[in-house]
């Protein structure tokens, strides 16, 4: 990408939900399609020494999505009223505020920490368990953070790009955060395994349904879905770690490390 929108890149609201992570990061490129130019020959050094392994893993993840998650998402989208879908998305996004708050604190961002705690408290109570995003209407902005961003803020480079089975796009630096975020999500604390699995499944399908309208645009940006999603992921992570304050040299430096 040669240019970025000032308000950043799309973030996965159903964070780390298996193959959905790949898809949401890919949609970062879709979000940029109205305000940026995609180039597969950009100046960015896309640190991908493990591509011979990454591509087959990506292909399996994508095939799994096309065979299972996409059809489920289409059915969900067709039979579920939009207000209910919004409520489901808000509910799961609210659960991620715990992860956001902890990492805002570790990054030395007291105001962002207070905002995340405030959002969690307000939406969990006035927002009926997070179904209604009351906090945003009160000016408390959602600021997604994770351990990978925290490690990056502390100065660690991204390391090589890696595609994990079902977990999708990652870097060596982001893998610990991907795993930790799962355990910081209250869904992981549920003792009833059947109910927990149902909730995780609903989260994944709801997250996937949010991409249906954008998916066709991806094929118009590039015929190489792997490269498209990789580029989107690497730039999105660099953008998030810098809180949007970076230029092309900063981006190249972070990705190349």
Would you name each region that the model predicts?
Residues 94-169:
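Mid-length scaffold segments of soluble, non-membrane domains
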Residues 88-91:
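Beta-rich strand-turn-strand
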